[in-house]
Swiss-Prot record:
Name of the molecule in the record: Arginine--tRNA ligase
GO cellular component: cytoplasm
Gene3D superfamilies named in the record: Arginyl tRNA synthetase N-terminal domain, HUPs, Isoleucyl-tRNA Synthetase, Domain 1
Gene: argS
Compartments, as annotated in UniProt: Cytoplasm
Lineage, top ranks: Bacteria, Pseudomonadati, Pseudomonadota, Gammaproteobacteria, Pasteurellales
Length: 577
């Protein structure tokens, strides 16, 4: 149930009947103040101006043609030409009851699309660090949301599994007689990487062997491929442990690394040359883009093949877009990476489109995000200035949550306490990130994210358990509750009912824009509205049984909505806290 969408369609139709053209937009928005209705149509004045009409007179014509008697109990013209829409309580009760009986809380499946979501993307032979957190959890929340909306989601973990570093690693493993790479742990690989790089820089014979191994690896040499595959497998097994701890849905089956596209690169570059898009410059192949200018004001050159024959990230990203359209048959491809890659992605996709590899109908979307900062406003690091490993961050989250929960509640069993600590600790880290607009930088603050006050995971998880506790105090059969009539008389009941029915608006926005913070804001508002409802409208002590059952229905849908919303964010809930 998307109230905004329904009202938009109906008001737009009335505007067209009143004389506006087909391209008009009703601009339906949720009202900020009750006296201005539940929703407002803000597009009347622009349409009236186009027609050369008085906005209020045109607004009246729109009302005369509006078919809203079932949804709205009152429509009024306000100010210079706004239309205030007051929803019908009878319609609200019908829709609330329908949402309660629907498996997806009343959210209907949209026109199904195949959507590729490229997220997380760590590097092979290195441990995940805090820099991977945002892409991993934001991308996963959007993937969950799009699946919930009925789309076919293909997760693409675009891992860095190709390049000269593998020649170094294979050569050094051989030097140290560590052919049994499968027995190694990732921490060993990180140390190996440092030593391999040192040897590569200081020992020309070693460097030559490493370069030879790169060539052999790229040409399919069985020994090199076997060693490379072991390095990839060890890395992804370790990364899977992080994904599981984060309650992220990525698996090893979702790995679509750079190596997947490697066989495509020579033919793509050759085709770009044939089309006249790629031209030679100092031995390299370059595509010049008029849409981007260099510091001299000339078209910017984007290298797609180096003079030594090597390919670049741009070439790989062109291949990835082509593959996702041609092979995966996707309608949309979303890439979650930081803002610093924005120009790179724009250029790669511009070349992709100029070459005709994807049609205009194929949506390529860079969902960029800002940086995670420390309290000093600088990139989040260890005290000594080093990179923070993701596993260490999650360990600290559990340690801090353990202290917090032990202080708050000693009435939980050990198993219950363990579940709460994990849900709160990991949930706090994720929610602190997801609740911020992804395009902005944000400050990582343990105290804020673990607070039981404000827009935090602990507050949301506690709000859920409070509602669960209401139902733990009653033995009402769920079937009987669903069959009971719902009445909406009190203003607090009405406000809660409307907010519950706005769930789909938030979810659709996340699916369209890739902005989980919109869902976080919605859930936080819902929890606050329920708290106000709970204080002013007795539930278990209601004046009669019918009101009690009616309010329990509102409480039940709130519980279900909070749980579903947090699940879409990848945040666990618990029954007791």
């Amino acid at each position: 149930m998307n109230i905004q969408s329904i009202l938009s369609d109906k008001i737009k139709q009335a505007m067209i009947l009143a004389g506006a053209d087909q391209s008009c937009d009703a601009l339906i928005r949720q009202s900020g103040k009750p006296q201005f209705g539940d929703y407002q149509a803000n597009g009347i004045m622009a349409a009236a101006k186009k027609l050369g009409l008085n906005p209020r007179e045109f607004a009246q014509k729109v009302l005369d043609n509006a078919q809203l008697s079932d949804i709205a109990e009152k429509l009024e013209i306000a100010g210079p030409g706004f239309i205030n829409i007051f929803l019908n309580p009878t319609w609200l009760t019908t829709e609330i009851s329908a949402a309660l009986s629907h498996k997806n809380l009343g959210i209907q499946a949209t026109n199904k699309q195949t959507v590729v979501i490229d997220y997380s993307s760590p590097n092979v032979a290195k441990e995940m660090h805090v820099g991977h957190l945002r892409s991993t959890i934001i991308g996963d929340a959007v993937a969950r949301t799009l699946e919930f909306l009925g789309h076919n989601v293909i997760r693409a973990n675009h891992v860095g599994d190709w390049g000269t570093q593998f020649g170094m690693l294979i050569a050094y493993l051989e030097k140290m007689q560590h052919e049994h790479a499968s027995e190694m742990e990732l921490q060993d690989l990180e140390a190996f990487y440092r030593e391999a790089k040192k040897h590569y820089d200081e020992d020309e014979i070693f460097a030559e062997k490493a370069r030879n191994y790169v060539v052999k690896l790229q040409s399919g040499d069985e020994y090199c491929r076997t060693m490379w595959k072991r390095l990839v497998d060890i890395t992804m097994q370790q990364n899977q442990h992080n994904y599981n701890r984060l309650n992220v849905t990525l698996t090893e089956k979702d790995v679509m690394g750079e190596s997947l596209y490697n066989p495509m690169l020579p033919s793509i570059v050759e085709d770009l040359k044939k089309q006249g898009l790629a031209v030679e410059n100092d031995g390299a192949l370059v595509v010049y883009l008029d849409e981007f200018k260099n510091k001299d004001g000339d078209p910017m050159g984007v290298i797609v093949q180096k003079k030594d024959g090597g390919f670049l990230y741009t070439t790989t990203d062109i291949a990835a877009a082509k593959y996702r359209y041609e092979t995966l048959k996707a309608n949309r491809a979303l890439v979650f990476s930081d803002t610093r890659q924005s120009q790179h992605m724009q250029q790669a996709w511009l070349i992709t489109r100029k070459a005709g590899y994807v049609p205009d109908s194929f949506s390529l979307e860079h969902k960029n995000f800002g940086m995670m900062l420390g309290k000093d406003g600088k990139p989040f690091k260890t005290r000594t200035g080093g990179t923070i490993k993701l596993a260490d961050l999650l360990d600290e989250a559990i340690e801090r949550a353990t202290v917090l929960i032990n202080e708050k509640n000693t009435n939980l069993s050990n198993d219950e306490k363990e579940a709460v600590i994990e849900a709160v600790g990991i949930g706090a880290v994720k929610y602190a990130d997801l609740s911020k607009n992804r395009t902005t930088d944000y400050v990582f603050d343990w105290d804020n994210m673990l607070s039981f006050e404000g827009n935090t995971a602990p507050y949301m998880q506690y709000a859920y358990t409070r509602i669960r506790s209401i139902f733990n105090k009653t033995d009402i059969n769920s079937t009987a509750l669903l069959a009971a009539p719902l009445t909406i008389k009190d203003d607090k009941e009405r406000t809660l009912a409307i907010k519950l029915l706005q769930f789909e608006e938030a979810v659709q926005t996340v699916g369209k824009e890739g902005t989980p913070h919109v869902l976080c804001a919605y859930l936080y508002e819902l929890a606050g509205i329920f708290s106000s409802f709970y204080e002013h409208c007795p539930i278990l002590n209601a004046e009669d049984e019918s009101i009690k059952l009616s309010r329990l229905k509102l409480a039940l849908l709130t519980e279900k909505t909070l749980k579903q919303g947090l699940t879409l964010l990848g945040i666990k809930t618990v029954e007791k806290m």
